[in-house]
Swiss-Prot record:
The lineage of its organism: Eukaryota, Discoba, Heterolobosea, Tetramitia, Eutetramitia. Belongs to the eIF-2B alpha/beta/delta subunits family. MtnA subfamily. Disulfide bonds: none annotated. GO terms for cellular component: cytoplasm; nucleus. Pathway: Amino-acid biosynthesis; L-methionine biosynthesis via salvage pathway; L-methionine from S-methyl-5-thio-alpha-D-ribose 1-phosphate: step 1/6. GO terms for molecular function: S-methyl-5-thioribose-1-phosphate isomerase activity. This is Methylthioribose-1-phosphate isomerase. The active site is at 257 (proton donor). One of its GO terms (biological process) is L-methionine salvage from methylthioadenosine. It is found in: Cytoplasm; Nucleus.
Amino acid sequence: MSSSVGATLEAIKYTRGSLEILDQLLIPKSFIYEVVDTTEKAFHAIRDMKVRGAPAIAIVAVLTLAVEANQLLQSNDALLADASAIAKLFNEKLDRLAESRPTAVNLFQAVGDFKNKIAQSLETNKTGTEIVQLIIDEAEALMNRDIEENAKISECGSDHIISTNPSSTTLKVLTHCNTGALATMKYGTALGVIRFLQKKNVLEHAFCTETRPYNQGARLTAFELVYEKIPSTLICDSAVSYLFKTKKIDAIIVGADRVCNNGDTANKIGTYHIAVSAKHHGIPFYVAAPFTSIDLTLASGDLITIEERSEKEITHYRNNDERAVVENIGVWNPGFDVTTADLISGFFTDIGVFTPLTCATTGKKYYDLKTQQAEKLKQQ
């Protein structure tokens, strides 16, 4: 383990054969990088939320496979001679990793993609060594794509907000949970947009919610904002509506763990009520996410599986495990909620901005992201 944080904030440190993650449960009190070199370590790091954020979860999962694949190559393990055995081994590892967090679509897409590539390798008579090398190469490619995607999201999102506020150089924005460099390889999604607004000298202030019960906003986003010297204020989750009423907020930007074809969006618990209040107060509400977070196979948010987390996250103090509430009270602790598409002003993605379509007959606003994606790609 190491405890140094460099000039550039990194949640994930990777070189071929080596993977370390910043234990986000300890921030801001401590900065400890933990070695992750087995599937089981990755499973527990993801499940226990030492690493979190949909893109980062997928990246840590596949980079762990890359580390294990590199170990096989370096040891010249006899297993490399058996392509079927190699495929079986890594498919089992992928299945295990998929069990860690049920809501983040990026992880399931990565697992599916890697399984397909392994199957194709067997069909084309690749050797065990070639399959192992493929796993390393594909994992590193996913890591590099995430960096590129975040930069594109941040650029197009900040440009869109500026274009819809053309006379303002004093923008005030709100974000929820943590969607920055700690949730990705670099920049972040929603927090990346805020970073780019600051870089373009149009941001006056960023507000972040504490994000109960795990306090990702208070522990992580507040830390990132201060680290980047962005003017910022932390508020209680329950203060959001009063903030909207008393301060001039120009935009809300959140991330996403899963987006449906119709635009319904699963994100950290508390997102939905922020969107409802934003609609009431006439403030645009944006979702920033890589297009890989959009599950075009899901018609609506009713089909999203919502992770329910331990009641201890609410009933006990995290630092000393002491009970904070009366015994025998019922507890409901969903980790996510679903914001309906009618509350969302637009999606900032790595392939551009998606705003609602208008039905020609009814005038009703709606999203059809599969169709909109196809149209967007035609234009590029």
